[in-house]
Amino acid sequence: MENTLPAFEAAAALDVAVQEFDVRQLRCGALVCVHDEDFDRTSDAAEVLGAGKPVRACTLDEVRRLDCGDGARVPTLEEALTVMLPGSVPLIEHKGGDADRYVEELQRLGVSDRVVLQSFDWRFLQRVAALAPQLALGALGPNPIYAEPDEEVLALLRGFGAEVLHWRADALTRRHAELAHAAGLLAFSYTTDEPEGWRRGIELGLDAMCTNDPAAMQDYMSGA
């Protein structure tokens, strides 16, 4: 049950250092945890709200009615952070919504210095940086404009204050990781769920690897 409190609680029980999750903004302005553009795949939304209703068109009252399985509900950003902090660093992936709203909510919760906010939309990150320079930012890639994190890309990221380069694992090389470190950024990869990928991440000198199987990854790393 991805992006639910039971999933976050299970990861917290493993004492993981970082928890990555997805957030979108509702029509009412609330920020909730969901990956897709609608709730159909991860809940009974097709039955409750009608198939294909966009997240951005929903209200929080509507979302509260959804069942993600075994009674789990769609959590708000605030509810997710309550589970993760202080044990893990929340790695919040912006999937949709306004920079102003994210900054407002993180400041209201008093966690601006305890989370990392990442996005594939670097214009969103630039807006966040202008509003809240204290927020740690992660740049996800590749994207349609930037295929690889070369010197030019890393200079751009440093220019608006990004602290994390988070790249797709099969598009990331040792040189990219070295360039990121030389520019003062951490180098993360997504998403590796097999030992071969974890071994490669270690060889590349990555600072973190996102996985859907943290228990197996912990077992592997303890014997690496």
PLM features: what roles do these ranges have?
Residues 4, 26, 42, 76, ...:
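Ser/Thr-centric signal marking residues that sit
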Residues 16-17, 50, 133, 205-208:
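Alpha-to-beta junction loops
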